Amino acid sequence: MASVLSYESLVHAVAGAVGSVTAMTVFFPLDTARLRLQVDEKRKSKTTHMVLLEIIKEEGLLAPYRGWFPVISSLCCSNFVYFYTFNSLKALWVKGQHSTTGKDLVVGFVAGVVNVLLTTPLWVVNTRLKLQGAKFRNEDIVPTNYKGIIDAFHQIIRDEGISALWNGTFPSLLLVFNPAIQFMFYEGLKRQLLKKRMKLSSLDVFIIGAVAKAIATTVTYPLQTVQSILRFGRHRLNPENRTLGSLRNILYLLHQRVRRFGIMGLYKGLEAKLLQTVLTAALMFLVYEKLTAATFTVMGLKRAHQH
């Protein structure tokens, strides 16, 4: 129990949250482009830079940063929960021994499930706020009018029921394999490099973080597309298809996507997603590693568990 409520776990959680917020702020416009490509499938522009130029031209210079605060708030909470859970469980399970790839995957999966169940309502709200006021090509999208985070929560609960705050939970639970795979490769690659050298450089951490995220994102991207559509929740779908992120709804959306756009329709926006998530993850891990190392050094502590 001491491992779960330890100061070391808190340091990891805060460093992870700060790292993710820093990285997402830097690369936020890329996430805006990715989300538009996923949700507004009738948009003619197919590349990241063309979508961003289109958004700036039609909606203003700051439009790529629309919804920044709710996204950053959600990301901060989400990564705090994930890093805290991941490092607490790892410390509890490993207990001073060397970790393994299998253990990293299991711990990452459990941490992901806890994170999804606690933070999905925040992501549903931030997805809608981020797309509010956007000029869509898809006439099936119903516009929203939220005054802020609290008002968005209020309107969603009032008009759609409290269960709507967990829209996309099922694909999100499937997508816990994304961070689990990411952390498995990250920790595994880090262990391999540390066998050959005493300390990792900033470039080492950046590259390892980028490679781990690229693999995880490519494997799980079709489900991420479905997740974005379900979280947005403003498409005019048939009532029987508007279930709470059920397997039936996921299969329906995947089928519709393939029928209308071919198999590559499942990967629409992947370029923007890879560009954004790979760079964001790499920078996040870099900030995270530097912050944890500096904090442990200043406080005269050793890491709670070995990698």
From Swiss-Prot:
A GO term, aspect molecular function: FMN transmembrane transporter activity
Positions in the Cytoplasmic compartment: 1-9, 88-104, 182-202, 302-307
Subcellular location: Cytoplasm; Peroxisome membrane
Tissue expr: Ubiquitous. Expressed in liver.
Taxonomic superkingdom: Eukaryota
GO cellular component: cytosol; membrane; peroxisomal membrane; peroxisome
Motif (Peroxisome localization signal): 190-199
InterPro entries for this protein: Mit_carrier, Mito/Peroxisomal_Carrier, Mitochondrial_sb/sol_carrier, Mt_carrier_dom_sf
Stated regulation of activity: Inhibited by pyridoxal 5'-phosphate and bathophenanthroline.
Keyword Isomerase recorded: no
Solcar repeats: 7-92, 99-192, 200-294
Annotated GO biological process: ATP transport; fatty acid alpha-oxidation; fatty acid beta-oxidation; fatty acid transport; nucleotide transmembrane transport
Pfam families: Mito_carr
Record keywords, A-Z: Antiport, Cytoplasm, Membrane, Peroxisome, Repeat, Transmembrane, Transmembrane helix, Transport
Family: Belongs to the mitochondrial carrier (TC 2.A.29) family.
Protein name: Peroxisomal membrane protein PMP34
Native species: Homo sapiens (Human)
